Amino acid sequence: MPKTKFRVESDLLGELQVPADAYYGVQTQRALNNYKISTTQMLHYPEYIIAIAYVKMAAAEANAELGVLDRTIADAIVKACQEIVDGKFHDQFPVDMMQGGAGTSVNMNANEVIANRALEIMGHNKGEYQYCSPNDHVNCAQSTNDAFPSAFRYTFVRMNRHVEKALSDLIASFRAKGQEFKDIIKMGRTQLQDAVPMTSGQEFNAFANNLEEEIANLERNAVLLKEVNMGGTAIGTGLNAVPGFAELCTIRLSEFTGDKFEKAPDLVEATPDTGAYVSYSAALKRLAIKLSKICNDLRLMASGPRCGLHEINLPPMAPGSSIMPGKVNPVIPEVTNQVCFKVIGNDTAVAFAAEAGQLQLNVMEPVIVQCILESQTWLINVMNTLRTKCIDGITVNVEHCYEMVKNSIGIVTALNPYIGYKASTKVAKEALETGRSVYDLVLEHGLMTQKKLDEALDPKAMTSAHAFIK
């Protein structure tokens, strides 16, 4: 007898064929039929799948301890969840990240996969839900409205660690370049005009310090995500959850994951609240803005090679033109800029979705999840790419940078304490009009002795605070 390719399952809307070997069930199949939207599936985010497995594991254990769920069924659910945490069955989470229903399809996808695997563990066949039901057992004392946000909050926390790691590595790369370039003199600029001298090391250390602030900012906002509303069920009132479940489930979730979670003090308030997502997304946006600005600087400093600033050399990664021979473009900073634009756009979508909540639930949470996970993933990837394919290989055109400083009118600023602002202005104007150097004009007009002028224009003296004697 040939093996059947499908099994038939039923729900509120009737019967539906499900692939016989699938661990998901009828409601996941409906979601697959309904939402062919983004081509981004839940299975593309392993951390998301792991997080929801932990939530279901904690709920099953808490329900068993409270006498609500049969211990044999609970143990099978916990074992199935552990297998998912260990990386199994991730291909059984095919639902589109973009969906209606406030995340119900995600929740039921998890419930069905866990139930069917638990059935096998107990010696039953997939779909024999009288022994372990996706709704009655795996989803016991839960609603999508508490299990779904608790899962993606934990997902964001897990992903944030990877964001911070990639950021820390990038900062270390900038610091290494700061040390490498500490004695290289270059011209600083404000408003794209020559300002005063600095070192390339100061510039790259500034990049590192600028980004360092974002680690603390990400951590501050990630803490907000560790408040969960498990036990609130549908709208936060706790209907169908026994007393003590909310507290115990949160404790077990903390134990299983190794992260400290807190039960929200007001579950009715917490159920529709999206404030933590808005804050965390804004932290990602702030990081993106800083990264993009740094990449703007890198592209400008690398401009040339003959007709631009040509201060630094970026590692050549690809031929730059199909028509212009020999052209090499700053492709890694460029792709970083574009990722940052996407993160900024995602944050705008998060803000609109957060504002769109109504009454006791915000049904727009799926797009919030998709946007934040995409922002985290893209930032991780692009920061690693920027570090390994750009920053680590940057070199400085030392002689060219020094020649620009030596020939710059901007160095006249260092003479203000010696000859005064008015005289310095006259020298600067004459240098600009005649093309002569500031150095020669100061000596010609007898404004300073050569010895004093050499001291005042000493490169090291010009790049830091120092005492001066008129």
Residue map of PLM features:
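Conserved, well-structured ligand/cofactor-binding cores
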Residues: 1-470
